[in-house]
Amino acid sequence: MCPHAHPPAKPDHGATTTPERIVHDEKAQLDFSRDMSYGDYLQLDAILNAQKPLSPAHDEMLFIIQHQTSELWMKLMLHELRAAIANVAADELGSAFKMLARVSRIMEQLVHAWDVLATMTPPEYSAMRPYLGASSGFQSYQYRCIEFALGNKNAAMLQPHAHRSDLLAQVQAAYEAPSLYDEALRLLARRGLAVPASHTERDWTQPYLESAAVEQAWLTVYRDPKQYWDLYQLGEELTDLEDAFRLWRFRHVTTVERIIGFKPGTGGTSGVSYLRKMLDVVLFPEIWKLRTDL
């Protein structure tokens, strides 16, 4: 060994890493008497005190949190959808693509959330069902706004919100506004594609009617992706979104059937039978049909 070399340092057994030492070494802030804390910023007191079970059933907490968290995700979904629609209307497709991709990922998150509720067995649900009254996810105003924003318009779906003028105003606004697909078709028309005026200047409150001319416009895009790259990408973003939405709906059906079978829903619908009918709704029909005709 070189005479000037230092021997290897011996481990300092007195400096054992502990949680306290890690926090000390990181200089983490511990006093929030004068600063906004994590809980303050997120308003956790309000959120975590919003679970008010009405029954003695242990599993009601799961039921409440499942639906409350779904409503939070739907709030974000609406935030992104509304911005995406505005961006498509303004020809700002780059921003719209990011927002639509986020909406699809939120829907995937909601698909997986059904796995948690599916741990509730029929007897467990039956123990709390009498306490639900007529309350039902069918009455979710945010979900109705999402359906309307995606083009599934139905005037009858305004009625469940008539008792709350503030909520009715939001649902009514979504009902009367152009949907995401309406704005996509208007964009195609602005780019010179032959979308008929019957589909670009119409009564937005009416259900969308499939059009052979609209399919031809999309076929033009899909037959030459290089020339119409951003419109082609828009078509695929819409496909991703509807694909995710179908999975979300399907998982809803299977979870409800697993828990209550074919009993009527608490909101007065036929339950699973009603949900199965909703699986047949196609939001962007021409984008799906063109795949056969390409």
From Swiss-Prot:
Leading EC class: oxidoreductase
GO MF, any single term: heme binding
Q: Which reaction does it catalyse?
A: L-tryptophan + O2 = N-formyl-L-kynurenine
Give the highest taxon in the source lineage: Bacteria
Q: Which Gene3D superfamilies match?
A: 1.20.58.480
Residues that hold heme according to the record: H252
Cofactor note from UniProt?
A: Binds 1 heme group per subunit.
Keywords from the named record: Dioxygenase, Heme, Iron, Metal-binding, Oxidoreductase, Tryptophan catabolism
Gene Ontology biological-process annotations: L-tryptophan catabolic process to acetyl-CoA; L-tryptophan catabolic process to kynurenine
Pathway(s) of this molecule: Amino-acid degradation; L-tryptophan degradation via kynurenine pathway; L-kynurenine from L-tryptophan: step 1/2
Any Pfam family from its record, for instance, is: Trp_dioxygenase
Q: Name the InterPro entries on file.
A: Trp/Indoleamine_2_3_dOase-like, Trp_2-3-dOase_bac, Trp_2_3_dOase
* SUPFAM superfamilies xref list: Indolic compounds 2,3-dioxygenase-like
Q: Where does substrate bind?
A: F63, I64, I65, Q66, H67, Y125, R129, T266
Enzyme Commission designation:
1.13.11.11
Q: Which cofactors is this protein said to need?
A: heme
Q: What does this protein do?
A: Heme-dependent dioxygenase that catalyzes the oxidative cleavage of the L-tryptophan (L-Trp) pyrrole ring and converts L-tryptophan to N-formyl-L-kynurenine. Catalyzes the oxidative cleavage of the indole moiety.
Q: How does it assemble?
A: Homotetramer.
Task: Check the record and name the PANTHER family matching this protein.
Answer: TRYPTOPHAN 2,3-DIOXYGENASE (PTHR10138:SF0)
Q: Which family does it belong to?
A: Belongs to the tryptophan 2,3-dioxygenase family.
Q: What is this protein called?
A: Tryptophan 2,3-dioxygenase
